[in-house]
């Protein structure tokens, strides 16, 4: 990260502005005022920003793109604009910027250069999902978009398993079914909420255990919209421990039953993690083959 940049006597301000996640009526009066007066608006997608401006009946004075692809280049450009006395707003396509969006490095640079930073609060799919999920809110962990690679995803699952906090996940419509399937394999029967298109006309909320949620969406030809999954607090340390009694039962069942039937039986009886039971059962089955 670059160090301080030489500045003039008058410094502009950086505004982090929340915008609607689906319903234009959710824009705040303060957000409208700040966006209309800003010298520069740095938007994740300028096309989406123009649509927002049209809906609000004003034209941005200056609009520039600021996203994952160009943030490292634009950070210093935006800082220099404020050091020249210009006020800059940062907006994402929807909701509160910096949550699964770029901006952290810009904030750090602004702090290093003594630039005032103001948050203009408003819509957030993270908080909106939490408050309607029906799950505990005293402690929560924001996951964002989980890794696509299995190794990294499994590490994340392991971390979440022992956290004992409600967790909030973002996922694309194309990958949400596979994510739910993976969650069920690791977490077993736990409560959750599936939220899609929040604040829009087609808003959908499905609450229940993960298998119930999956059964409601897996056969759909197309799943559209922004998706959030909220999971109940997990403290699965006990789910990952196999007692001696269970080990003996697995060994006995493997004598006359298929691996799948043994796993299904033990998981149903004990509520243990399917992955853990499967791995142990497979290990025992391989031992039997060598005898």
Briefly describe each language-model feature range.
Residues 1-67:
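Glycine-rich, flexible N-terminal cofactor/catalytic loop recognition
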Residues 14, 140-162:
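A short, charged helix-loop
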Residues 35-41, 115-118, 166-167:
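Short active-site oxyanion
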Residues 66-72, 146-149:
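Conserved helicase motor
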Residues 84-147:
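Short glycine-cluster motifs
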Residues 43, 119-122, 169, 194:
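General beta-strand structural signal in soluble alpha/beta enzymes
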Residues 11, 87, 166, 170-291:
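A contiguous loop/helix-start segment that scaffolds small-molecule binding in enzyme catalytic cores
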Residues 47-49, 95-96, 125, 175, ...:
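Alpha-helix capping/helix-boundary segments
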